Amino acid sequence: MTIATAARSVLLALLTLVSSATCVFADVLVRWDQTQAPSKQVLGITTIVVPGANADAVRHAIAEGYQVYVEVDGANVSGFTPAGTPVHGIVVTGNASDADIAGLRTRLKLPADRVLVAQSGAKWPHIRTNWVTKNNDVLQVTGRSAQPWIENNAALLRILQAERPGRTPLLTYRWQPITRSEIDEGPSLEHYLVAIAEAGSFGGDLVLPLHERFQQRLLAGEAAARSEWIEIRRYLEFYSKDFPTRYRPVVNVGVITSHPMVWFETMNLLARHNVPFEVLTPVQLATRDLKALRLLIVLDQPEGAALDALERFTRGGGKVHKVTAGVSDPNSFAFEIRKLLGADDRVVDIWNGITVLIAPYQSPDTDTVLVTVLNYAYQPLPVQLRVRGTFGAVHYESPDNRREIVPHQHRHGYTEFILPALRVGGRVYLSQRSAGR
C-alpha cells in the first residue's frame, strides 16, 4: 500500500468520526454601556450592544452610525420598546418565554436572526489560581505544579449545540474580579483575548462586555488603551472569519443523557482533559447510526429500542461505560475515560499543555482537518500535538502569526508536530496535499 493510499484510508476512517456541522468562527459583539461611544472610525467596528436601560447611550450610538443591538432583560421583554430608532436588533438576557420572544420580533418588525437570546450559565474563561479545597475540615491550597482549574465554556457550548443543532449558541457573562486592582481596572488585555478565542474555538457567539474603566480610557484616548484595543480588534477579526464551509466536530465518544446540565461537571472535566464528545439522548440511540463512535458513556439508562441499540453497539465492538451511582470525582472519571479509550482511539493527544484546550473539526467537502488550540494561561508555550491520520501538510495561523508551515512526522497512524510558542489561540490545518503542492 502506498503512503498516499494509506493516508486516504486513514482519512476515510476519520471522516466516520464526525458529527453535525458547526461554526469554527465567532460573531463577537462588543457591549458598550457608557452614554457616549467613540466613533466607528476609532473603534474600527460597525456593531455594538447597548443596554436598553440607558436610553441616552442607545440614541448616541445610533447617531454615531453604529448598528445597535439593544440589550434587554428577559423579565422586561413583554411590552419592551427601545429608545431611539432604528435599532439593528435585540439581545435578550435572562429568562424569557418563546411567546414573549416571538411577540417582540413581531412588535419591532425584526427578522428572527436579529433577536438574539443569550444563554445563561456561562463564565468568563480564566484559570483559577491557588485553588482551595477542604479535606477533613482542613483547607488545602494547590501547589504551582498541580493541574490548574480552568473556568471554561467548552462543555456548555457542546451541550447547547446538541440541544439546538444547526444554531450557534450566544453567550455572555460578567467579569468576576479576583484582586482589588481587578475590581477597579477590570480584566487584563489577555482576559479579553482568551474570551474571544474561546468563542471562536468552540463554535459560540459572544456578547463581550468591556469594563467601565476600559471604556472610559478609550473615550479619553489613552495611548495604552488604544494599543490594547488594536490587539483586541485583531482577535475579533481573526475569529470572525466566516468560512464558506461549516466544519464538523470530530468526535468518537458519545455521552448518553436526557439531562445534560445535571451531569455538567462530568462533561466539563471531559472537555478539560481534551476528550471530544457529543451529547445524545437515550431516545436518539434507537435512531442514530453509532458506527462513528468508539465509546458510549451511559449516564441515563436507556429502555426499549434504545437499550437494543446499545446492545448492538457492544456486539459490534464498541465500548460502553455505564454510570450507575453518580460521578463523585469528575476529574478521576475523565482520566478513566481517556484510559478506556486507549491511545489508538484518541482523536487528539496533547503534551506540555496543561492549560491548553483543543477542538478538532473536519471539512465535509475537502480532506482538511482543523484543530483549534487555546492556551488559557496566555503565556507563550511550546505544545506538542498528535492528531489521528497521516497528513501531508500541517499549517498554523493565529492572530499573532501569519499562516506558516509546521514540521511534522508520522507515527503509528498519527501526525505529530510542535507549536513552538502558543500564546493564546490559533488554528492548525492538516491536509493530505503536501506543503509544496
Residue ranges and their predicted role:
Residues P249-N252, I256-N274, K291-L295, G353-G389:
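Carbohydrate-binding surface patches
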Residues E404-H412:
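Extracellular/luminal ectodomains and secreted, surface-exposed scaffolds of diverse proteins
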Residues R386-R402:
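Solvent-exposed beta-hairpin/edge-strand motifs
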Residues M1-A7:
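N-terminal secretory signal peptides that target proteins for export/translocation
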Residues V24-G318, K322-P330, Y414-F417:
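Glycan-processing catalytic domains of CAZymes
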Residues H321, R411-R437:
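C-terminal beta-strand-rich structural cap/linker in extracellular carbohydrate-active enzymes
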Residues S9-S20:
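Bacterial N-terminal signal peptides
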Residues V327-W351:
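C-terminal helix of von Willebrand factor
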